[in-house]
Amino acid sequence: MWSLRGLRLAAGHCFRLCERNVSSPLRLTRNTDLKRINGFCTKPQESPKAPTQSYRHRVPLHKPTDFEKKILLWSGRFKKEEEIPETISFEMLDAAKNKIRVKVSYLMIALTVAGCVYMVIEGKKAAKRHESLTSLNLERKARLREEAAMKAKAD
């Protein structure tokens, strides 16, 4: 019996024999760039085309808004607003925004620590005055009981 591989080899052999006898105009219509690999046809890899001269190493520029100009000043990129060019690169703006983000996060960390220290100091002062949540709740409940008792007497 013929195996599948044997049939494929025989068909390929017949195809090559017939291809030699075919006239040249018909042969030219066939894609000559195809390669035969294990009986399969594949297109050759195309080399990447060189970029055109006008777009090589060109970074798109951005006209900064007033707020973005302030960000550039606060980040220390420029000393005065007059020094800021009319158009800047996105990378410069991103770097300035990242610096501001870091500065704001440091400020928030410092404010959080200062708030914690303030709350600890206030808590210690309240403890010296013997003020606690438990004592405040007991006083409030006692006051509510008195008001309820007075209301019951009045009715």
Swiss-Prot record:
Keyword RNA-binding appears in the UniProt entry: no
Note the superkingdom of the native organism. Eukaryota
Q: Could you list the residue ranges that cross the membrane?
A: 102-121
Q: Which Pfam families match?
A: DUF1075
Q: How does it sit in the membrane?
A: Single-pass membrane protein
Q: One GO term of the cellular component aspect?
A: mitochondrion
**What is the protein's known function?**
Proposed to be involved in regulation of apoptosis; the exact mechanism may differ between cell types/tissues. May be involved in hypoxia-induced cell death of transformed cells implicating cytochrome C release and caspase activation (such as CASP9) and inducing mitochondrial permeability transition. May be involved in hypoxia-induced cell death of neuronal cells probably by promoting release of AIFM1 from mitochondria to cytoplasm and its translocation to the nucleus; however, the involvement of caspases has been reported conflictingly.
How does this polypeptide assemble, per the annotation?
Interacts with HSP90AB1; HSP90AB1 is essential for FAM162A mitochondrial localization and pro-apoptotic activity. Interacts with VDAC2; the interaction is probably involved in inducing mitochondrial permeability transition.
Q: Which PANTHER family match?
A: GROWTH AND TRANSFORMATION-DEPENDENT PROTEIN, PROTEIN FAM162A
Q: What is this protein called?
A: Protein FAM162A
Instruction: Give the species.
Output: Rattus norvegicus (Rat)
Q: Which gene does this sequence derive from?
A: Fam162a
